[in-house]
Amino acid sequence: MGRANKVVLAYSGGVDTSVCIPYLKQEWGVEEVITFAADLGQGDELEPIRQKALDAGASQSLVGDLIQPFIEEFAFPAIRANALYEGRYPLSTALARPLIARRLVEVAREVGADAVAHGCTGKGNDQVRFDVAIAALAPDLKVLTPAREWGMSREETIAYGERCGIPAPVSKKSPYSIDLNLLGRSIEAGPLEDPMVAPPEEVFAMTSPMSDTPDAAEEIEIAFEAGNPVAINGQVLDPVAMIREANRLAGSHGIGRLDMIENRVVGIKSREIYETPGLLLLIQAHQELESLTLAADVLRSKRQLEMQWADLVYQGLWFGPLKDALDGFMDRTQQHVNGVVRLRLYKGNATVIGRGSTQSSLYVPAMASYGSEDAFDHRAAEGFIYVWGLPTRLWAASQRTSG
């Protein structure tokens, strides 16, 4: 008897997930493999996937359009949380995994599968994200992980696939592993594994090389309501269109490239190249608007919790209790994050040059001004400073006495 009867495999069309199809059937005795590929805004990349999975031995090849929930339910909460893993990476890949896992479980229920599978290796982050999410959503489903167990090198995996009639998609000329969705691209492997090797221009697709960016700066305005971006330059956009337009604007100016050494969940460091033009632009604008509309103590607390929120998502704990609790905090803070941020885009940089809110601004010109309209009570400062500095004076006096 095989490890499962009917399996739904999370399918990308890459080497590992393609080889998983014959491997599950031939090596693990799975009777039927159904593949599911998520359309997350990859574009034309998904067109050949259906037939490729069928050619590899899948009984059904399903593709699901998840673009709208991806942006509304995953990307927008990340913008509201200013989610930047290790202060830099806006989680463009990590945000997709809990959504794929959720839909994978739903498909398994619909087709009566007794297991799900993925093609993640044993040293990556995605295996953690998929396994933990599936365990939270459907603890009764088996999770099969052939790529984690088969012990084959990448070359051996490609050779196994070729014996099963699966062509190798990666050539020596292009040795990179690329993950793509509407939020961005992640590029790794090949010569990029040497952290001293500069990424060649050929690995980028969403951002213009600096030599091709406009020589004139472009100023734009992004409007937010309840923490969500809703308009660019006065044009109201739905969430998906918002990301597309932000990608276009930022990418055309070469904004959104990241080259970083990243600490993976499994404990190793990896070199990652990311392109996330629109998401980084929107997070930057959102942060700036919060500085205008949130009280100081709320803002300080939120900045600390943002790091924890990003860590939880990166570590595959989207469906965990702490993430759920932090969502409540984030949502509550966003009620008054309404307004407009003006940015100047130029040669790889987005610079905030203005911000305003007619509804929620806590910036009071009469209090901030040093001119004749100054309404701040300067006389009150003396008493405030006396009380504020009292602990310091008492401590200093005790040091003089003991010394």
UniProtKB/Swiss-Prot annotation:
Which pathway, metabolic or otherwise, does it act in?
Amino-acid biosynthesis; L-arginine biosynthesis; L-arginine from L-ornithine and carbamoyl phosphate: step 2/3
* Pfam families xref list: Arginosuc_syn_C, Arginosuc_synth
Keywords of this protein's UniProt record, alphabetized?
Answer: Amino-acid biosynthesis, Arginine biosynthesis, ATP-binding, Cytoplasm, Ligase, Nucleotide-binding
| Sequence positions that bind L-aspartate | 121, 125-126
Q: Which residues participate in L-citrulline binding? A: 89, 125, 129, 177, 186, 262, 274
Would you tell me the Gene Ontology cellular component terms? Answer: cytoplasm
The Gene Ontology terms for molecular function here are: argininosuccinate synthase activity; ATP binding
Biological process per Gene Ontology, one example term: urea cycle
Record flagged with keyword Hydrolase: no
In this chain, ATP is annotated as bound at 10-18, 38, 119
| Subunit description | Homotetramer.
Q: Which NCBIfam families match?
A: argG (TIGR00032), PRK00509.1 (NF001770)
Spell out the family assignment given in the record's similarity comment: Belongs to the argininosuccinate synthase family. Type 1 subfamily.
Question: What's the name of the protein?
Answer: Argininosuccinate synthase
Organism encoding this protein: Parasynechococcus marenigrum (strain WH8102)
